[in-house]
Every structure is written in structure tokens, then in C-alpha cells.
């Protein structure tokens, strides 16, 4: 559901997956549905309701980011397994309702969070789970996506582009939470009031009357550690846009900048330092690291779309995916493969409803703290998924 510039990246991945029998598309704008139907030679519907009436058992939601919750809820209520782009929803009540529907129906819900497959998150998780980090102390992650780097279509949608940054928190949150295996329990956050001379973050323009373009938070985790999460849309940076800049335990730590990944460990009176860049960076990036303009090109998002990194287990993907395009640090293929396997085998997906809520709700609550000038607020939790 949703025939736009983002969903086009995923339709072929569904079409080629060995567990998928057929694919159809839908959009509430009939012309878009017809265009995609003809482009991919599949059935198409000119409304979400008509799609839900069809003989299908799974729905993928690729509507605008602030609209996902109601679509997911309706699909679950109609007995469909559901995949949605991020975020899960923009209201805590919708997140809770999705979790309760999954509990009640036994259906599969997966949020398509790219960043749990990002090499920096996978590396921190690997070292933390091995015990080499010790107890988790502190981590930093951010999603820095300046609106000047958005597509023209998004820049021109003034009602939607001014969404509060913390309503799109899952990239930054998921990277550190997936690595620690913990969840956020309390948040204090502050925002930057936009002063640029354009109508994006202005009252009376966007749907939220939002004037905050950048937001910054500290969150307490259930394991006792603290994380700093930034969501910025007016920021002098481009790439990487989603990354862990620091991740520390009592015994070891990880640091990152541009294309350099450093792992340190306490050893007696000093530390050992290991440059793990060749293990964590995409293979195409490493192959070009001796170029004179290498850092400049990394800062402009080169080699960060479809090239796998050695740490990513790309050999487990279906052979049918070998010649297909990838995206977002080579995460797209993992996302669709994981959902299709979960729906086919009726098992918990990687980012199930409970985990999706833990990646989403802290951001929604953080914005409430922003509006209250940094007042600490407890973060509600939807609990753990059932043991399979």
C-alpha cells in the first residue's frame, strides 16, 4: 500500500522472494496504483479497502511516515500479516493497539527498520554480547538528515515535511537498543527552535504547528546505562545520516567518525586500540579507501547504499536476490527476507510489534519532554514478546 518513490525499492524484492506467490499494489490515488500495476505487471487497487478485501495474507505499508499507525491497525483487524515502513505509528495509543492486536490475533507485524542491519550497530552488538564491552555504560546515536537532502517531492510537501523530528526516531534508537538488548525507561529532551527563512518549521504550515527542527535527548535504559539520541533536520552534515558515534561499556568501547571505526579495550594500566574499519565499512568503501578524495566522497554518501559489509551475513539471503538492487547500507534485502520468512513460517520477525514499540514510543515521549523544556518523563513499555 502506497505507490511512491520509497516503495518502488521493495516491490521487486517481494516479487522475487521464494516464499511469495503473487504481489499486488494499491494507492488511494488511482493513477498511482495503475502506474505501479503496469510498471510491475501486477494487479492493482485504487483504495486500501479494496486491497484488504482481496485474497491476500500479508500487506506492506509504504504510506507517508506519519500515517502508518491507522493503516497497520486496519490491516491487522482484517486478518492480514503486516509489514510497515518506519515508524510503527505517531501516537503511543496506536503503538499499544498494534501490540494488543498482534497478541490477540497471533498475526505477524514487522516494522522495516533498516538500522538494525547497519554494520556499526551489528558490530557493537557483537562485541557487547561477547562480553568484551563489559556492562553497558553509555551510547550515542543520531539521525542527521538535513531537509535540503530530501527529495523535491518531500521538500514541497509543507504539511508533512515539518513533522517533529522525534516522531521519526527509530533509526537512531534502534541502533543502540538493538546492540544493548535493553529499552528506554525515562527521557529528558530539548529542541532547537528553527530560525531559517522558509516555511517548513512554522506554525500554521505543517500539520503539527511544529517549530522544532532539531531535537536532542538523554534516555535512561532498563539496564542502567544512558544513551544520547539526536534527531536533526537542519544540520550541516550529509553522510552517514544514521550512525552510532560512541558506544561504551565498563571494559571496552567503540568510536566512529566519517569512515573510521575504532574498538578499544581496557588492559591493565592502558588500552588496546584496534581499527576495525575494514570489517565494518561496506566492501565498496574499503576498496576505494586510498583515493585522495575518499573522505569527501564518504561525507557525500558514496558507497553507503547497496554494498554489503563483511560483518553482514549476506550469504544467507535467497539466491533470487543476487542481481536485485539493494539500499540503505544494504539493508533492504535483509528486511524483506526476514518478513517473508516470518510470515511464511509464522515466527516472530526481527523487529516484531514489541520491539517496534520500544524503537518508536521513546521518541514520541521525548517530544513531550521537548515541549515541556526538558522535563524528565517516564517512557511506557509494552513488554516482551511471547516465548516461541
Describe these PLM feature segments.
Residues 178-199, 204-268:
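Glycine-rich, aromatic-lined ligand/substrate-binding cores of catalytic
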Residues 57-58, 64-65, 69-116, 131:
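Beta-strand-loop-alpha-helix segment that lines the small-molecule cofactor/substrate pocket
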Residues 43-54:
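Short acidic low-complexity segments
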Residues 1-40:
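N-terminal Rossmann-like dinucleotide-binding module
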Residues 108, 115-210, 215:
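Predominantly a Rossmann-like dinucleotide-binding segment in NAD(P)-dependent oxidoreductases
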Residues 114, 200-201, 207-208, 220-221, ...:
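C-terminal glycine/acidic-rich active-site capping loop/insertion
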Residues 107, 134-138, 368-388:
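C-terminal capping/lid region of NAD(P)-dependent oxidoreductase domains
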Residues 46, 84, 109-111, 140, ...:
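Hydrophobic residues in well-ordered beta-strands that form the structural core
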Amino acid at each position: 500500500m502506497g505507490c511512491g518513490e520509497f516503495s518502488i525499492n521493495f516491490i521487486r524484492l517481494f516479487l522475487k522472494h521464494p516464499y511469495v506467490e503473487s504481489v499486488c499494489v494499491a494507492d488511494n490515488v488511482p493513477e498511482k496504483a495503475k502506474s505501479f500495476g503496469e510498471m510491475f505487471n501486477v494487479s492493482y487497487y485504487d483504495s486500501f479497502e479494496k486491497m484488504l478485501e482481496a485474497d491476500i495474507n500479508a500487506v506492506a505499508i509504504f504510506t507517508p511516515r506519519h500515517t502508518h499507525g491507522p493503516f497497520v491497525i486496519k490491516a491487522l483487524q482484517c486478518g492480514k500479516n503486516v509489514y510497515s515502513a518506519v515508524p510503527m505509528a505517531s501516537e503511543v495509543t496506536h503503538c499499544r493497539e498494534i501490540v494488543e492486536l498482534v497478541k490477540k490475533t497471533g498475526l505477524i507485524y514487522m516494522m522495516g527498520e533498516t538500522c538494525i542491519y547497519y554494520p556499526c550497530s551489528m558490530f557493537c552488538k557483537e562485541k557487547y554480547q561477547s562480553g568484551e564491552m563489559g556492562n553497558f555504560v553509555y551510547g550515542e546515536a543520531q539521525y542527521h538528515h538535513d531537509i535540503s537532502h530530501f527529495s523535491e517531492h518531500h521538500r514541497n510537501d509543507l504539511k508533512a515535511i515539518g513533522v517533529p523530528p522525534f516522531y521519526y526516531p527509530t533509526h537512531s534508537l534502534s541502533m543502540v537498543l538493538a546492540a544493548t538488548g535493553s529499552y528506554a525507561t525515562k527521557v529528558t529532551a530539548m529542541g532547537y527552535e528553527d530560525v531559517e527563512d522558509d516555511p517548513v518549521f512554522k506554525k500554521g504550515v505543517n500539520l503539527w504547528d511544529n517549530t522544532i527542527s532539531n531535537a536532542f535527548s538523554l534516555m535512561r535504559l532498563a539496564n542502567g546505562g544512558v544513551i544520547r539520541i539526536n534527531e536533526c533536520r537542519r544540520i550541516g552534515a550529509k553522510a552517514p545520516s544514521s550512525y552510532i558515534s560512541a558506544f561504551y561499556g565498563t571494559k571496552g568501547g567503540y568510536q566512529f567518525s566519517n569512515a573510521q571505526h575504532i574498538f578499544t579495550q581496557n588492559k591493565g594500566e592502558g588500552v588496546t586500540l584496534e581499527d576495525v574499519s575494514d570489517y565494518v565499512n561496506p566492501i565498496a568503501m574499503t576498496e576505494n579507501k586510498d583515493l585522495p578524495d575518499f573522505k569527501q566522497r564518504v561525507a557525500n554518501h558514496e558507497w553507503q547504499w547497496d554494498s554489503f559489509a563483511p560483518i553482514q551475513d549476506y550469504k544467507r539471503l535467497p539466491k533470487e536476490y543476487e542481481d536485485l538492487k539493494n539500499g540503505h547500507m544494504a539493508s533492504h534485502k535483509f528486511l524483506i527476507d526476514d518478513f517473508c520468512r516470518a510470515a511464511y513460517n509464522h515466527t516472530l520477525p526481527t523487529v516484531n510489534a514489541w520491539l517496534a514499540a520500544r524503537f518508536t514510543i521513546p521518541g514520541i515521549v521525548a517530544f513531550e519532554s521537548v515541549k515541556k523544556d526538558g522535563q524528565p518523563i517516564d517512557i511506557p513499555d509494552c513488554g516482551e514478546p511471547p516465548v516461541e
